[in-house]
């Protein structure tokens, strides 16, 4: 066997909290070979990122403690390297791409300067030579107009372009090992596929080894050769990507695979990881299909009943345009057509999926329906009432009937008030319950309904995980007993295991409360699981609308076909 690029033996990482040391990583072993990719998979908090940061010595030494029997790069022990020696290792031997490029790139410096800085730090070259190399790197990572991007600030680039700049920075000094920490999590499926293809291409050209950190086994299938599955700071299972994805042995791995919404069958609900750990699904996929699959006849009967009613929501030729201005007098010279002539109907009890890439107008459409963004033209009717004509108290009354769950639960919640007060606030604003004791009892009941507990009432948002915060936002949206709920990318920031729990919760609440959903997402597998019908948007316009199963199995529009083709599968790369 060839000497691994990276060898880690018995790595242990502890963090200090309130004077006590708590071990977060419990003695893991890692091997990464040249030209191969190790997929490091697990939920948030499993220790994936901490392990890689510990190898690179990037953890805060005041609050962390790293111990290992051995950490070797190409057979050279680096465990006892000084900080100066480690600074030389970083960038030249090991480099890292982080999850969020906007926070990794300095907003006050131009992109080209930041990548040049990496080269100048590690190599003795002139600034002119460094600039020339950066422009070539930008070409290598397939950035459009590399000279222009060299002189651009991070905020002027799209998410995918910023991630390409980060990749260029990471490979600037030809590292032997690249650590990619969730580099595609926040990206659209089409951009995600491009980044994965780019990383594979760069690996083929340079022969570098790679550690690819993710919570999504579908992404691992696209890029990894070997897989290690982490949970609570331990590696539970390891093997080739084919072994792990096709024949998972550990219940946790089986659960991670199963909680991803399937594209080939319809399920009443998604299995969750805890059920696998509790031994509930020992019969595997056959048992899941037997217990949870929705039959074609069952779905047909459901849809016939659904569409026999009159639509709850009607949107007719809706437009939301934003003016572009220039000159001293701010003359309007054009418009950004965020929503451009969209018509649709949503029936009571239906879930309409709304999909498209970032910037396609799906969020603006949702906000325009609720009048959170003012439409430029067109009409919206809700239960026979023209929403676009409402003002004052009538508009406030409509907002009791229609609510929204936003993408980022942390920024949706006021950090200064308890979550109980946050959920009670809309009840008080809309005069649903003025008695504080009764209001508190109603909030506690809502907390129980969304899978939290009454004792959580007096806690603050920062005390909860991402999945719990999203449950709080759902509870707040339900506080006014709405009939329509718009879910705007409400699970996109969550691990697949937590995502499954929230999707199951949304469907359960829909049945119990007879809710109607507009479900906005760029994740097509989630949209198919949730939706009865799907509308695909591109550049503000609707390009295809159909029954969800029909649209995914027989897409008509080329853009829809492109979105579906970009979906990461759970079948490993050849």
PLM segments and residue spans:
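Conserved signature/switch motifs of ABC ATPase nucleotide-binding domains
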Residues: 91, 155, 172-173, 462, ...
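Conserved ABC transporter NBD signature motif
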Residues: 65-77, 378-386
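Conserved ABC ATPase "signature" region
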Residues: 129-148, 386, 437-455, 564-565
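Conserved ABC ATPase signature
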Residues: 152-157, 161, 460-464, 468
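Short catalytic/signature loops enriched in Gly
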Residues: 4, 144-147, 241-313, 324-330, ...
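A short, proline-enriched helix->beta-strand linker immediately N-terminal to the Walker B motif
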Residues: 172-176, 479-483, 499
